C-alpha cells in the first residue's frame, strides 16, 4: 500500500467517527454540568473504543434508534449537528493567523450545516451555495497565509490535507450540479458531511504540526 493510499484509508476510517464528536460530544458537554467525573469517564471510554473500532459510536446510535423504532434521516441529522467546534481539532496557538483559521473553518461548517433548512427553497439555497463558495475561498486563503508566514518540517502533510480539501470541495460542487438534475438531496447532505470532515482534518493537521 502506498503512502497516499494509507492516508486515504485513514481519512475514510476517521470519517465514520464523525458521529462521536458531532452527536456524543455535545451530550458529554451537557453531562459535565451534572456529573463532571462521569462525563470525563464516558468521553474517554468512547474515544478509546472509537479509536480501536472506527464507526462503533455510529453503530451503537443506529441500533438504539432501530430498537426504539425511531425513523430519521441520519445523514441529514449528522449534517445539522456537525457545525459545533470540536476541542480536539481547534488550534490553540494565539497568533492571529491560526485564530483566523479556526474562525474560517467554523464559518464554513456553520453554512454547510444549514443546507437541510435551505435546500427546498431554491432562491435561498442558491444564496447558500454562493456563501459556501466564498467560505471555501476564505479558508484556503487563510491556509495559504499561514503557509507564507510559518515554516513547517512536516509541510508535506499540510499540503496533502489542503489537496484533499480542494478535492472534496470540487466533489461537493459536482454533487450540487447533479442535484439540480436528479433532486436527490441525500447526496448533497453526504457530500457536505465529507467537506465538514475535511475542514476538521485541516485544523487537526495544523494543530498536530504547529
UniProtKB/Swiss-Prot annotation:
It comes from the Eukaryota. This is Programmed cell death protein 10-A. Its main location: cytoplasm. It is a peripheral membrane protein. Promotes cell proliferation. Modulates apoptotic pathways. Increases mitogen-activated protein kinase activity. Important for cell migration, and for normal structure and assembly of the Golgi complex. Important for KDR/VEGFR2 signaling. Required for normal angiogenesis, vasculogenesis and hematopoiesis during embryonic development. Required for normal cardiovascular development. Promotes cell proliferation. Modulates apoptotic pathways. Increases mitogen-activated protein kinase activity and STK26 activity. Keywords: Angiogenesis, Apoptosis, Cell membrane, Cytoplasm, Golgi apparatus, Membrane. It is found in: Cytoplasm; Golgi apparatus membrane; Cell membrane. It comes from Danio rerio (Zebrafish).
Amino acid at each position: 500500500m502506498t503512502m497516499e493510499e494509507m492516508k486515504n484509508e485513514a481519512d475514510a476510517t476517521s470519517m465514520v467517527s464523525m458521529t462521536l464528536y458531532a452527536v456524543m460530544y455535545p451530550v458529554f458537554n451537557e453531562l459535565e454540568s451534572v456529573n463532571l467525573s462521569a462525563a470525563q469517564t464516558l468521553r474517554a471510554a468512547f474515544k478509546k473504543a472509537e479509536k480501536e473500532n472506527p464507526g462503533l459510536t455510529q453503530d451503537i446510535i443506529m441500533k438504539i434508534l432501530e430498537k426504539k423504532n425511531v425513523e430519521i434521516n441520519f445523514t441529514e441529522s449528522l449534517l445539522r449537528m456537525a457545525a459545533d467546534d470540536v476541542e480536539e481539532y481547534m488550534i490553540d496557538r494565539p497568533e492571529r493567523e491560526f485564530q483566523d483559521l479556526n474562525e474560517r473553518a467554523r464559518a464554513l461548517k456553520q453554512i454547510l450545516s444549514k443546507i437541510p433548512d435551505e435546500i427546498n427553497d431554491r432562491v435561498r439555497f442558491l444564496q447558500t451555495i454562493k456563501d459556501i463558495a466564498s467560505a471555501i475561498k476564505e479558508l484556503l486563503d487563510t491556509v495559504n497565509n499561514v503557509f507564507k508566514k510559518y515554516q513547517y518540517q512536516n509541510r508535506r502533510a499540510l499540503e496533502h490535507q489542503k489537496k484533499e480539501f480542494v478535492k472534496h470541495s470540487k466533489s461537493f460542487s459536482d454533487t450540487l450540479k447533479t442535484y439540480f438534475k436528479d433532486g436527490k438531496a441525500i447526496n448533497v447532505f453526504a457530500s457536505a458531511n465529507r467537506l465538514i470532515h475535511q475542514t476538521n482534518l485541516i485544523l487537526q493537521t495544523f494543530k498536530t504540526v504547529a
